[in-house]
Every structure is written in C-alpha cells, then in structure tokens.
C-alpha cells in the first residue's frame, strides 16, 4: 500500500534538541561569516533547517531525505527560504557533495509522521501493512523480510537490533504463524503474536512487548546500521577545515557507532566526551525526545 503524498495533514513532526543543534554550530570558527553552507542529512519535516535558516540569513542548506512524503512536507515548511534550501532525494550515505560545507547535522530518529501514519507500517498502535520502509522504493519491506529469513537468522536479527532476550522464542512463533496461517494481516496481528511469547505479567507493562522486535525489523528493513557506518566514514570528507558534524541518535547501537567514530577517527576532534541529552522541559513537551543523544565533532 502506497502513502498518499497529496495528504500532508498528519505530518506534525517535532524536531528534537533544536537549541542544542544550534549551539553546536557555534563551535565553527566562521559560523557568522557570509556564504555559509551546510547539509541537513536527515531533513525530515524541515524543523532543524527551518530554525537554522531563520538564524543565519546568509546560510544555504542542502537537505537530504529518502522519504518522498518528508520532502514534500519540508518544501511547504521551508517555502519562505526556497532560494536557500536545496532538497535532494537521497539517503545520506549515498550522497556526494560537489563542494565542502561548514557543517553537517543528522537526526537519526524515525520522524513522527512515519510512526503515526498507519499506512507506513512502523507502529502497532494502529493497524497497518507490515511495511516499515523509509524509502518506499526499497525492494524488501518487513513482511518480505520475515518471510525470507530462516528462524535462526530472524532470531539473531531481533536480538542484535532489538536487544530482545526472547528473540529465539519470538522468531520461532513468527515462522510457525507464517507456516500455519500464511501472511500476517498487519502490524496489530504481528504485535499480538509477539506479545503471546511473554509471560502474562509482562504483556501489560508501560512498554509493549513487541516494541523491541518492531525496532529490530525497522532497522533491518532500512539497513540503518550499515547506512550509518558508511555515513560516518565519509562525512569528514564533506567538511571544510574546522567544520562541525552533529549527530542525534536514539538507541544504543547508533550511539556506540557515533561515539566510536568521533573518538577514534583521526580526522576529527571529539567535542562531546559525554552525549548531550534533551532538557527536562523538552522531554515534558515531547516524550519522543527522551532517548535522544547528541554528539559533536570537529574536522581538524
């Protein structure tokens, strides 16, 4: 099922740690000079770029996003800055800039539209197809993934990307369901089946028992870890001397990769020994910000 790009009424994503992102760029020695150029590697709804373009009147930004719905929404949000924003249909790991820039920002979180639109299949709060593709042109969605993987590989995936200790039991149940009943009807049926793998007392906790498995499937479908690894390898080559790279991550796998890169890449100076986290005020206003971690590095 395709997302209707003509309907942007439900795109209401709140950008995370905007103030902290803005402050991170002050490390760049020429941040207040004319002809400033930057890359928003995860444009989303355009929130971070909007605030940056408002603050720096001579700033030009290249905004990258593989999600066509996000790009359409960002175009509307950033219309007043259309002469200074260049929106590209690209995964950040595949992009090759023609010239070096002063900064790169990346927010690795799933945007609220992707979570809240049931047709995207990222969530089980409302029933939808087992999709989970950030780029609808990808060949393999979540439904296809659980079909083609054998039980062992599916269990390993759920454990590695979801840190789910019941991964083997869950994988066994999923493959048994597929064998006996064919495809799942949607996200709710899969979530219900996963919940059945847990003891009754654990099925009704604050965090739904299917949450970790859904995270693992989403990461695998979009190859998020492989893409991030490639991005971290190439992004220093995008920067001018003294340029800033600011990355917000939302789970431990991502944060470990960013931390390791910023600490060990000899091209970079690590500016955050410990990650910057959202303020209590922001978390109160936007619960989805609570697990965000911002790390900053500077090109030597």
From Swiss-Prot:
Broad class of where this protein is predominantly found: cytoplasm
GO term, biological process aspect, one: rRNA base methylation
SUPFAM superfamilies: Putative methyltransferase TM0872, insert domain, S-adenosyl-L-methionine-dependent methyltransferases
Subcellular localization: Cytoplasm
Domain of life: Bacteria
Enzyme class: transferase
Similarity-based family: Belongs to the methyltransferase superfamily. RsmH family.
Protein's name in the database: Ribosomal RNA small subunit methyltransferase H
Record gene name: rsmH
